[in-house]
Amino acid sequence: LRANADLKLTVIMTVYNQEKYLARALDYLLEQKNQQFKLLVIDDGSTDSTAEIAASYQDRFQAFDLVSKANEGVAAARNLGLDMVDTPYFIFHDGDDWVEPDYTDYFIKAFDRHPDDDMVTCGYYVDQAGKPSVPITKPVEGELTRIEAVLKVLGSAHSPVKGYTWNKCYKTQLVRRLHLRFNEDLDLMEDQVFNIDYLMQTEGCYYSSVPLYHYWQRADSAVHTVSWDHFWSIVGANISIYKSIFSHLWQKLLSKRPQTQEYQGSYVRERIKDDHQS
């Protein structure tokens, strides 16, 4: 690893048996207009040449770290990445996807322009073999409150935010302070659960639907394979999401309770005083 104290962004790329696609992902990162980022590749126990391909790129990035671990799933791999981040901001990148040249520059500059926002998001393309890239929505941008951002994450298929992690940039300090982790018991939607847990503790989000990320939809992807295990994982994820939302709202209600009681007490005292004077 060649560290640079001036780097602001870490790109966490978790990979597993992606020898067919990894070189493409890394080549596009090499073409970034802003190279002031660290690339952290977590190999989750690949049994093909994924690790060797990643290692061959080590000297081509300004800051690069490759970590190989036993296969435990994407959530555990991302959690290891969270433990290793040492830059102010970080973002996730899947090993079979690729990005536009402005990808890293956009996130770094967006946080510089919107320092009070705790998350920055971008738009994305959906890509399939033999088909042209399709942007997911029309260009829009702006700032969202906490609740607005949560609704976008939980929103429709054409939401410019959605629940993915790869089109979002996070503040490392906030994740550390809140001890946020990916749920390793979930096979699906662990990214959406993480995003809700994160957003419920934030002050706001800056979003743009300008597409900078290419989401490669593979026919053999686990996301597109239906099974009972996936069904129950989705059920568990939705339970976690709404528990997080209601827990935060309940805590917010309790935090206002002393003010409410003080107002009620003052109101009662004034009524007693009025009764004595009448």
What are these regions (language model features)?
Residues 7-10, 38, 193:
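Cell-envelope/extracellular polymer assembly enzymes that use nucleotide-activated donors
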Residues 95-205, 213-230:
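Donor-binding/catalytic cores of nucleotide-activated saccharide
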Residues 214-278:
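C-terminal subregions of glycosyltransferases and related glycan-biosynthesis enzymes
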Residues 69-85:
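Glycine-rich, basic loop-to-helix element that forms the pyrophosphate-binding segment
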Residues 17-31:
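Short, well-formed alpha-helical segments that are part of the catalytic scaffolds
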Residues 43-52:
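A conserved acidic beta->alpha catalytic loop
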Residues 90:
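Short aromatic/hydrophobic "clamp" motif used to bind/position activated sugar donors
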Residues 29, 44-45, 72, 95:
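Conserved short acidic donor-positioning loop in nucleotide-sugar-dependent glycosyltransferases
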